[in-house]
């Protein structure tokens, strides 16, 4: 009996040690795999696509990035993308696309002064400068907007599942859920349709 008990103890101890070793190896391997594919949580990382087919990795860019038909596009020290309207020669209908990968986030200031904080796995399409009587952007994913007040030019966010319209306010738009747009209002008023 004593030998049988020792053999059982040895068997179960060896099995537990092997399982623990396999679990530790799997965790290490999967962690390395995830880190190589995705940005770290909260990392200021995004790619900017412009009309001429060029793309810019915003994590590796210096302050000044390029001119968009006379409008200076640059990053400030906080890695925030800005469209400088002071240098704008003319209204520009060119559209840019900001693509934020999994685990990343990125902030930008649009030409009208609206601040946008785009979250992970988000895509924002917007004009270099707003023309006409509306300020329109297109969002897939999630972003926080601090809209510059302009009663004559409403700010409109198009999502795959609806439209959000405001004049000047602070709100969050989330389209991660399938067939659903969630709007969280921090201040002001919005119309959702």
Give each language-model segment a name:
Residues 1-5:
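Disordered, charged N-terminal biogenesis/targeting segments of membrane/secreted proteins
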């Amino acid at each position: 009996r004593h030998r049988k008990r020792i053999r059982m103890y040895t068997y179960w101890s060896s099995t537990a040690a092997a399982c623990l070793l396999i679990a530790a190896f799997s965790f290490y391997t999967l962690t390395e795999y995830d880190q190589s594919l995705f940005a770290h949580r909260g990392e200021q990382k995004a790619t900017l696509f412009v009309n001429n087919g060029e793309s810019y990795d915003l994590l590796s860019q210096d302050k000044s990035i390029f001119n968009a038909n006379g409008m200076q596009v640059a990053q400030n020290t906080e890695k925030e993308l800005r469209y400088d309207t002071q240098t704008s020669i003319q209204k520009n209908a060119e559209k840019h696309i900001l693509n934020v990968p999994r685990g990343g986030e990125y902030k930008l200031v649009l030409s009208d002064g609206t601040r946008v904080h785009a979250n992970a796995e988000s895509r924002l399409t917007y004009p270099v400068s707003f023309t006409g009587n509306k300020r329109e952007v297109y969002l897939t994913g999630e972003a926080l907007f601090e809209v510059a007040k302009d009663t004559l030019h409403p700010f409109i966010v198009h999502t795959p599942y609806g439209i959000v319209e405001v004049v000047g306010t602070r709100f969050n738009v989330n389209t991660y859920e399938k067939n659903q747009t969630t709007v969280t209002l921090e201040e002001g008023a919005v119309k959702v349709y």
